[in-house]
From Swiss-Prot:
Protein name as catalogued: AAA-ATPase At3g28580
Protease found in the keyword field: no
UniProt keyword Transmembrane helix, yes or no: yes
Cofactor field: Mg(2+)
Gene Ontology cellular component list: endoplasmic reticulum; membrane
Homology family: Belongs to the AAA ATPase family. BCS1 subfamily.
Membrane-crossing segments per the record: 7-29
Reactions the enzyme catalyzes: ATP + H2O = ADP + phosphate + H(+)
Subcellular location: Membrane
Domain of life: Eukaryota
GO molecular function: ATP binding; ATP hydrolysis activity
């Protein structure tokens, strides 16, 4: 027995010495490391009783974050603050408490059915360095699970399933809806191309200034979509739906998006096309969006050259080929910026309903525009933008919603006058302007004062509209007179030439 103990002691000492020598050798002769590592792994594997499993945040050629990694992250968060020695501290908006989580390069233990396992949070730096106007994170994160090889069957068959199930439960319990942005120049802390803040917009369909039947129609459409996973699979289409919101500024397009997100409890991705590098970058952004989300491109007419002024030859080609025939360069909001951007209309069309649009599911894509007539028909046809919603000027029903929201007033003698101005006189005022007039300017102002101010504003709008029409008529008349003068001058010259 003493001889056996001495043998193990000598073996341990020899292995320790060998590891020390290998570490020094690897430091001074790094080129030979890869050739020696397989041999050393086989050697130590005979004596090392533990198995390791690695879960990378991004694995292989996958663009999307690993669901296994995210599940483990949620699972370990429940008791890492009590077990880990190195913690990361963050604060949540609207709360004075500090949220603690497991720091990088930290280890905690976990017990399952009498078996102890070890979890490590690891991080590696990138081996290459490059300069780019579109910087990406230079670190790779992963979790490493270590357990005794005698417990292999239990860990693989039951423990990992337990971790994923519990992690998903914790994630759903703590889920906080987010507003994502792809604005460059922000530090994301990982490889994600999106940064986010908590989505806290209070808009709902109850507070939305719109006709009641129109709101009910939109809500029914959203409910039908959210429950149609099997139906979309049956008909062979990606589980997504496109909405086009169009109308003058101030008619509530952004508020509509917020109401949709709150109604469905979806995250919102605000996609700024002018900051996207190229079509590949656009696909990566799409892949990183989660299910149960709304992807928004606001003012789409300002992001791409979508005026529809295509050549006659292109208009005659079949619709199935429009992705190849209408490819155009991006129009920058500010010339001179983002000159490296190479996103094309073709790339955007593929983003909406091409092969890459099927990655994931349960997504709503929303375009907004002030000038729907300027958009290329190929972009907004059915199948891409399935539902077109006009966000128009304030009607009487929309006014009543605003009066309830702003003043908590449901009936007033002045309602009849406001109804006459909006419906009979057909005065055009946006919901934003109506709301501004209904907003009390001081604590002393009551509902009656605000309603009177709105009536005066509507009358002023009527006079301004009348004045504008008169000015347009005068301008038309001046143009007609100018044309007559030109024609008379031509006729005069013609007579002189004939006389000569």
């Amino acid at each position: 027995m003493a001889m056996m103990g001495q043998l193990w002691t000598n073996t341990g000492s020899a292995l320790a010495t060998l590891m020390f020598v290998y570490t020094i050798f690897k430091q001074f002769f790094p080129l030979f490391g890869p050739q020696l590592e397989p041999f050393l792994y086989r050697l130590f594997g005979r004596f090392y009783p533990y198995i390791q499993i690695t879960f990378h945040e991004y694995s292989g050629e996958h663009f999307k974050r690993s669901e296994a990694y995210l599940g483990i992250q949620s699972y370990l968060s429940k008791d890492s603050s009590a077990r880990a020695k190195k913690l990361k501290a963050n604060t949540t908006k609207g709360s004075k408490s500090i949220v603690l989580s497991m720091d990088d390069k930290e280890e905690i233990t976990d017990d399952f059915e009498g078996i102890r396992v070890w979890w490590q949070s690891k991080k590696e730096g990138a081996t290459r360095q490059s300069f780019s106007f579109y910087p990406e994170a230079n670190e790779k994160r992963y979790y490493m699970l270590r357990f005794h090889r005698r417990d292999r069957e239990v860990i693989i068959e039951r423990y990992l399933e337990h971790v994923m199930r519990e992690g998903k439960t914790i994630e759903q319990k703590n889920r906080e809806r987010k507003l994502y942005s792809n604005t460059p120049g922000q530090s994301h802390g990982n490889n994600s191309k999106w940064s986010h803040v908590t989505f806290e917009h209070p808009a709902t369909f109850d507070t939305l200034a719109m006709e009641e039947n129109k709101k009910e129609e939109i809500k029914s459409d959203l409910i039908k979509f959210s429950k149609s996973k099997d139906y979309y699979k049956k008909i062979g289409k990606a589980w997504k739906r496109g909405y086009l919101l169009f109308g003058p500024p101030g008619t509530g397009k952004s508020t509509m998006i917020a109401a949709m997100a709150n109604f469905l409890e979806y995250d919102v991705y605000d996609l700024e096309l002018t900051t996207v590098k190229d079509n590949t970058h656009l696909r990566r952004l799409l892949i990183e969006t989660s299910a149960k989300s709304i992807i928004v491109i606001e003012d789409i007419d300002c992001s791409l050259n979508l005026t529809g002024q295509r050549k006659k030859k292109e208009e005659e080609e079949e619709d199935g080929d429009d992705k190849n025939t209408i490819e155009k360069k991006m129009m920058m909001k500010n010339e001179g910026e983002n000159k490296e951007s190479k996103v094309t209309l073709s790339g955007l069309l593929n983003f909406i309903d091409g092969l890459w649009s099927a990655c994931g599911g349960e997504r709503i894509i929303v375009f907004t525009t002030n000038f729907v007539d300027k958009l290329d028909p190929a972009l907004i046809r059915k199948g891409r933008m399935d539902k077109h919603i006009e966000m128009s000027y304030c009607c009487f029903e929309a006014f009543k919603v605003l009066a309830k929201n702003y003043l908590d007033v449901e009936e007033s003698e002045m309602f009849e006058e406001i109804k006459r101005l909006l419906e009979v006189e057909e005065i055009k005022m946006t919901p934003a302007d109506v709301g501004e007039n209904l907003l009390p300017k001081s604590e002393k102002e009551g509902g009656e004062t605000c309603l009177k101010r709105l009536i005066e504003a509507l009358k002023e709008e009527k006079e301004e509209a009348k004045k504008k029409v008169e000015e347009e008529e005068e301008e038309k008349q001046r143009k007609k007179e100018k044309v007559k003068e030109i024609e008379a001058e031509k006729e005069k010259k013609k007579k002189i030439e004939e006389e000569n």
